[in-house]
Amino acid sequence: MKLDLKILDARMRDQLPAYATTGSAGLDLRACLDEALTLKPGETALVPTGLAIHVGDAGYAALILPRSGLGHKHGIVLGNLVGLIDSDYQGQLMISTWNRGETTFVLNPMERLAQLVIVPVVQAEFNIVDDFETSDRGAGGFGSTGKH
């Protein structure tokens, strides 16, 4: 699929989102910072990417997801857990960054911070009913299908 990409910061021309391998699902997004950003434990920051996208097709959306290494090794995850980019959004991609770790983390300019994944979207239509057809699970919720 083709995705319209607008470069908002000239430095990003040489740092375009890219798939790390042929099997990668996510495009790496970088922190478009002028200087290093220090995040103390528990702090959050909204980090610019220097890029804007326009998916343009209501059958798709983009997700901003954390990079697994940053989360596991340093406790750096997304403040909103997942960023949903609707197909009609055209503004700069911003990364809500949260240091859930126990030590201070320094984010350097142009460091890979998150990943962008394009996903198909189906918009649902509601069918109002008085009752549901019986299923094996019924209304069983959290933990209702067993311990393991």
UniProtKB/Swiss-Prot annotation:
GO biological process: dUMP biosynthetic process; dUTP catabolic process
GO molecular function ontology, one term from the record: dUTP diphosphatase activity
Names of the cofactor(s): Mg(2+)
Known EC number: 3.6.1.23
Keyword Hydrolase: yes
Ligand binding (substrate): R67, S68, G69, N80, L84, I85, D86, M94
Pfam families found in the cross-reference section: dUTPase (PF00692)
Keyword terms, alphabetized: Hydrolase, Magnesium, Metal-binding, Nucleotide metabolism
Gene3D superfamilies reported in the protein's UniProt record: 2.70.40.10
Pathway of action: Pyrimidine metabolism; dUMP biosynthesis; dUMP from dCTP (dUTP route): step 2/2
The keyword Cell cycle is annotated on this UniProt entry: no
Catalytic activity: dUTP + H2O = dUMP + diphosphate + H(+)
UniProt-listed CDD domains: trimeric_dUTPase
Known role: This enzyme is involved in nucleotide metabolism: it produces dUMP, the immediate precursor of thymidine nucleotides and it decreases the intracellular concentration of dUTP so that uracil cannot be incorporated into DNA.
Family recorded in the similarity comment: Belongs to the dUTPase family.
Listed name of the protein: Deoxyuridine 5'-triphosphate nucleotidohydrolase
Species whose genome carries this gene: Paraburkholderia phytofirmans (strain DSM 17436 / LMG 22146 / PsJN) (Burkholderia phytofirmans)
Organism phylogeny: Bacteria, Pseudomonadati, Pseudomonadota, Betaproteobacteria, Burkholderiales
Gene that specifies this protein: dut
